[in-house]
Curated annotation (Swiss-Prot):
Pfam families: SMP. It comes from the Eukaryota. It comes from Arabidopsis thaliana. InterPro entries: LEA_SMP, LEA_SMP_dom. A motif (Nuclear localization signal (NLS)) lies at residues 7-11. The lineage of its organism: Eukaryota, Viridiplantae, Streptophyta, Embryophyta, Tracheophyta. LEA proteins are late embryonic proteins abundant in higher plant seed embryos. The function of those proteins is not known. Residues 58-115, 123-181 form the SMP domain. Residues 1-51, 145-182 are annotated as: Disordered. This is Late embryogenesis abundant protein 3.
Length: 182
Protein backbone atom coordinates (compact mmCIF):
# COMPACT_ATOMS: atom_id res chain seq x y z
CA UNK A 1 0.00 0.00 0.00
CA UNK A 2 1.42 3.38 -1.00
CA UNK A 3 1.96 5.95 1.68
CA UNK A 4 0.76 9.48 1.06
CA UNK A 5 3.09 12.40 1.58
CA UNK A 6 1.43 15.26 3.45
CA UNK A 7 2.49 18.84 3.12
CA UNK A 8 3.77 20.42 6.34
CA UNK A 9 0.98 21.74 8.50
CA UNK A 10 0.98 24.63 10.87
CA UNK A 11 1.12 23.29 14.44
CA UNK A 12 -2.18 23.37 16.29
CA UNK A 13 -2.46 24.65 19.81
CA UNK A 14 -5.23 24.21 22.36
CA UNK A 15 -6.82 27.58 21.57
CA UNK A 16 -6.69 27.04 17.84
CA UNK A 17 -9.31 24.30 17.42
CA UNK A 18 -11.26 25.36 14.35
CA UNK A 19 -10.91 22.65 11.67
CA UNK A 20 -9.88 25.04 8.90
CA UNK A 21 -7.01 26.44 11.01
CA UNK A 22 -5.02 23.23 10.61
CA UNK A 23 -4.68 24.02 6.91
CA UNK A 24 -3.68 27.63 7.26
CA UNK A 25 -5.48 30.89 6.74
CA UNK A 26 -8.81 30.70 4.93
CA UNK A 27 -10.23 33.84 3.35
CA UNK A 28 -12.59 35.01 0.67
CA UNK A 29 -12.64 38.04 -1.54
CA UNK A 30 -15.76 39.38 -3.21
CA UNK A 31 -15.89 41.30 -6.45
CA UNK A 32 -16.67 44.46 -4.47
CA UNK A 33 -13.43 44.06 -2.48
CA UNK A 34 -11.43 43.72 -5.68
CA UNK A 35 -13.16 46.74 -7.22
CA UNK A 36 -12.44 48.90 -4.16
CA UNK A 37 -8.76 47.96 -4.36
CA UNK A 38 -8.76 49.00 -8.02
CA UNK A 39 -10.77 52.17 -7.44
CA UNK A 40 -13.85 50.93 -9.30
CA UNK A 41 -17.32 50.32 -7.97
CA UNK A 42 -20.11 47.91 -8.83
CA UNK A 43 -23.80 48.63 -8.88
CA UNK A 44 -25.93 46.76 -6.37
CA UNK A 45 -27.00 43.43 -7.94
CA UNK A 46 -30.60 42.28 -8.26
CA UNK A 47 -31.03 39.72 -5.43
CA UNK A 48 -32.98 37.33 -7.69
CA UNK A 49 -30.28 37.22 -10.35
CA UNK A 50 -27.14 35.27 -9.57
CA UNK A 51 -23.73 36.79 -10.08
CA UNK A 52 -20.67 34.86 -11.13
CA UNK A 53 -18.66 33.72 -8.16
CA UNK A 54 -21.56 33.81 -5.75
CA UNK A 55 -20.64 31.61 -2.81
CA UNK A 56 -23.82 32.11 -0.82
CA UNK A 57 -26.39 30.64 -3.17
CA UNK A 58 -26.82 27.98 -5.84
CA UNK A 59 -27.99 29.12 -9.26
CA UNK A 60 -29.97 27.13 -11.80
CA UNK A 61 -26.88 26.98 -14.02
CA UNK A 62 -24.78 25.67 -11.15
CA UNK A 63 -27.39 23.02 -10.35
CA UNK A 64 -27.31 21.92 -13.99
CA UNK A 65 -23.52 21.80 -13.89
CA UNK A 66 -23.77 19.63 -10.76
CA UNK A 67 -25.81 17.19 -12.83
CA UNK A 68 -23.01 17.14 -15.41
CA UNK A 69 -20.61 16.21 -12.62
CA UNK A 70 -22.80 13.53 -11.05
CA UNK A 71 -24.22 11.92 -14.21
CA UNK A 72 -21.97 13.22 -16.95
CA UNK A 73 -21.57 9.87 -18.71
CA UNK A 74 -25.31 9.18 -18.87
CA UNK A 75 -26.80 9.54 -22.37
CA UNK A 76 -29.40 12.30 -22.60
CA UNK A 77 -32.97 10.96 -22.80
CA UNK A 78 -36.38 12.61 -23.15
CA UNK A 79 -36.75 12.86 -19.36
CA UNK A 80 -33.45 14.78 -19.12
CA UNK A 81 -34.41 17.02 -22.03
CA UNK A 82 -37.75 17.92 -20.42
CA UNK A 83 -36.07 18.73 -17.11
CA UNK A 84 -33.38 20.83 -18.80
CA UNK A 85 -36.04 22.72 -20.76
CA UNK A 86 -37.98 23.45 -17.57
CA UNK A 87 -34.80 24.61 -15.83
CA UNK A 88 -33.84 26.89 -18.72
CA UNK A 89 -37.37 28.32 -18.81
CA UNK A 90 -37.20 29.08 -15.08
CA UNK A 91 -33.77 30.71 -15.45
CA UNK A 92 -34.53 32.85 -18.50
CA UNK A 93 -38.27 33.43 -18.23
CA UNK A 94 -38.59 32.40 -21.89
CA UNK A 95 -41.08 29.60 -22.49
CA UNK A 96 -39.68 28.78 -25.92
CA UNK A 97 -36.20 27.25 -26.28
CA UNK A 98 -33.53 29.61 -27.56
CA UNK A 99 -31.59 28.59 -30.68
CA UNK A 100 -28.28 27.22 -29.38
CA UNK A 101 -29.69 27.02 -25.86
CA UNK A 102 -29.51 24.16 -23.42
CA UNK A 103 -33.09 22.98 -24.01
CA UNK A 104 -32.73 22.84 -27.79
CA UNK A 105 -29.40 21.01 -27.47
CA UNK A 106 -30.86 18.54 -24.95
CA UNK A 107 -33.89 17.82 -27.12
CA UNK A 108 -31.70 17.25 -30.17
CA UNK A 109 -29.43 14.98 -28.12
CA UNK A 110 -32.37 12.93 -26.83
CA UNK A 111 -33.72 12.49 -30.36
CA UNK A 112 -30.29 11.54 -31.71
CA UNK A 113 -29.68 9.12 -28.84
CA UNK A 114 -32.96 7.31 -29.51
CA UNK A 115 -31.74 6.58 -33.04
CA UNK A 116 -28.16 5.70 -32.05
CA UNK A 117 -27.31 2.06 -31.33
CA UNK A 118 -23.77 2.43 -29.99
CA UNK A 119 -23.62 3.74 -26.40
CA UNK A 120 -20.26 5.39 -27.06
CA UNK A 121 -21.75 7.45 -29.91
CA UNK A 122 -24.56 8.88 -27.79
CA UNK A 123 -24.59 12.47 -26.51
CA UNK A 124 -24.05 12.55 -22.75
CA UNK A 125 -25.33 14.86 -20.02
CA UNK A 126 -21.84 16.39 -19.66
CA UNK A 127 -21.84 17.29 -23.37
CA UNK A 128 -24.90 19.48 -22.77
CA UNK A 129 -24.54 20.78 -19.19
CA UNK A 130 -20.82 21.20 -18.46
CA UNK A 131 -20.87 24.99 -18.96
CA UNK A 132 -24.57 25.55 -18.25
CA UNK A 133 -24.11 28.60 -16.00
CA UNK A 134 -22.24 30.44 -18.76
CA UNK A 135 -24.80 29.48 -21.40
CA UNK A 136 -27.85 30.64 -19.43
CA UNK A 137 -28.54 34.33 -19.94
CA UNK A 138 -30.02 35.70 -16.74
CA UNK A 139 -29.07 32.70 -14.59
CA UNK A 140 -30.81 33.06 -11.25
CA UNK A 141 -30.83 31.56 -7.78
CA UNK A 142 -32.73 28.25 -7.55
CA UNK A 143 -35.99 28.48 -5.60
CA UNK A 144 -38.26 25.70 -4.39
CA UNK A 145 -40.74 26.75 -7.11
CA UNK A 146 -38.04 26.29 -9.76
CA UNK A 147 -37.19 22.85 -8.38
CA UNK A 148 -40.87 21.83 -8.29
CA UNK A 149 -41.33 22.86 -11.93
CA UNK A 150 -38.30 20.83 -13.01
CA UNK A 151 -39.35 17.79 -10.94
CA UNK A 152 -42.82 17.98 -12.53
CA UNK A 153 -41.38 18.17 -16.05
CA UNK A 154 -39.09 15.21 -15.42
CA UNK A 155 -41.91 13.13 -13.90
CA UNK A 156 -44.28 13.88 -16.79
CA UNK A 157 -41.64 12.68 -19.26
CA UNK A 158 -41.00 9.42 -17.41
CA UNK A 159 -43.02 6.32 -18.23
CA UNK A 160 -42.28 5.10 -14.67
CA UNK A 161 -43.19 8.49 -13.13
CA UNK A 162 -39.76 8.64 -11.47
CA UNK A 163 -36.98 11.18 -11.51
CA UNK A 164 -33.42 10.16 -12.33
CA UNK A 165 -31.34 9.74 -9.15
CA UNK A 166 -28.64 12.43 -9.29
CA UNK A 167 -30.32 13.95 -12.34
CA UNK A 168 -31.52 17.44 -13.15
CA UNK A 169 -34.53 17.34 -10.81
CA UNK A 170 -32.41 16.05 -7.92
CA UNK A 171 -29.74 18.71 -8.47
CA UNK A 172 -32.33 21.49 -8.67
CA UNK A 173 -34.04 20.23 -5.49
CA UNK A 174 -30.71 20.05 -3.66
CA UNK A 175 -29.84 23.58 -4.78
CA UNK A 176 -33.20 24.91 -3.61
CA UNK A 177 -32.79 23.21 -0.22
CA UNK A 178 -29.33 24.72 0.21
CA UNK A 179 -30.63 28.16 -0.72
CA UNK A 180 -33.49 27.89 1.80
CA UNK A 181 -30.98 27.16 4.57
CA UNK A 182 -29.16 30.45 3.94
Amino acid sequence: MAQHQHSPQRPRDQDNTRPHDQYGIVFSVSGDDVARKQGDSFSQPDPTVATMGSVDTVTIGEALEATALSLGDKPVDRRDAAAIQAAETRATGESKGRPGGLAVAAQAAATTNEQTVSEEDKVNIADILTDAAERLPGDKVVTSEDAEAVVGAELRSSSEMKTTPGGVADSMSAGARLNQQL
